[in-house]
Amino acid sequence: MNKYIQEVRRRSQTLLIVEGNHEKNDLFWLIFKCFPELNIDMENVWIYGTNIYQFYDDIEKEYGENWDEEDVDIDLPYVVSRKKTPDNLRYKNDFTNIILVFDYERHDTFFSKSKIAMMQKRFSDMTDMGKLYINYPMIESYQHLKTIPDADYKDRKIPVLLQPGKRYKELVRKESVIQPHVYFPHKLDDLLDKHFQITDLGIRQACCEDILNFSDRQHMDERLDQVLQNIPEDPRKKTLKFQLKHWIDRANYANEGKTYWQYMRDLFVKIIYYNVCKASNIQKGVYLIKSEQYRESFESLDPGIILDKQNKLSNTDAGYIWVLNTSVFIVAEYNFSLVEKFGITATGDDLQRQGRNSCEGDGRCEDALA
């Protein structure tokens, strides 16, 4: 292959450095499936495996204690690959965009306001050294909507003393209207694998993909019969068909004439809107954003101001943290038109009206897969 062509191909890549498995294998796997326009290779989603405060220390070890000075050029792909894959070093020149996604983790023993503030300040441009997206209090905050629409999201916060992190995860598990939908593909695979012993990976994946692409509830029986033809004969096949039909009905996507991916894409657009509104409220005291102001409001968000306010509000044991997910902003950052395609712009009365059709009233979202 021509060396120049190979270099162009490598430079067109986007690198995503995340904290843990959930970010890569649940959230961003799903986002990339729902928004293929992002064109990010899952191989370029690197799991760092520890928190932002350890990341700060690793950068300091590599570049010295004055690494935060403006003239120090930080090569994050090198820092991470040197630690995780020393036999396969990578450099920032290999990538066009570098994105970091980490949790706020106020509860962590090594929490440091100065360290996280410096990380937010230094990593503000994905086309240069990288851009940091902080989730408050943790990555699971993107799931922390109780209904769609959720009028209370504006004021959703957690006490500083809600520690350790697994307590927040448990709270989200109990309250989230989003979580059952996020895990639906994984639960579907587990059902076929562990409960019905469909161990052939190719057959199982084909079945899951077909089911996730259903969009017509009226012909559900015929479609399921076609899918199950590929499964070896088993006396439990009839039971499996009825269980799948129930799950698909509760997941609600086919009821709306959408595939699972279309349904989740629309749901993510709503999640993004709610979090843009929340970030705007934290920063400027303005929550409900009208359609004509949506892009401007998003582009005026300042992660440094938001972090500073979160630090001040959570400074004592009596304090609190606003629930906010900024990692979903990656979609809007890539191409804002992707979040404008739902309804008008998924804002105001339009969001309220369309939201009621999917996740409120009949309990489908709350009880999906129950």
Q: Can you annotate each of these PLM segments?
A:
Residues 20-24:
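Short acidic, Gly/Ser-rich segments with clustered Asp/Glu that frequently serve as metal-coordination loops
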Residues 14-17:
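Conserved beta-strand elements of the Class I
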Residues 51-78:
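Charged, often glycine-rich, active-site loop that binds/positions anionic groups
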Residues 2-11, 25, 29-46, 56-60, ...:
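C-terminal accessory helical subdomains adjacent to catalytic cores in phosphodiester-
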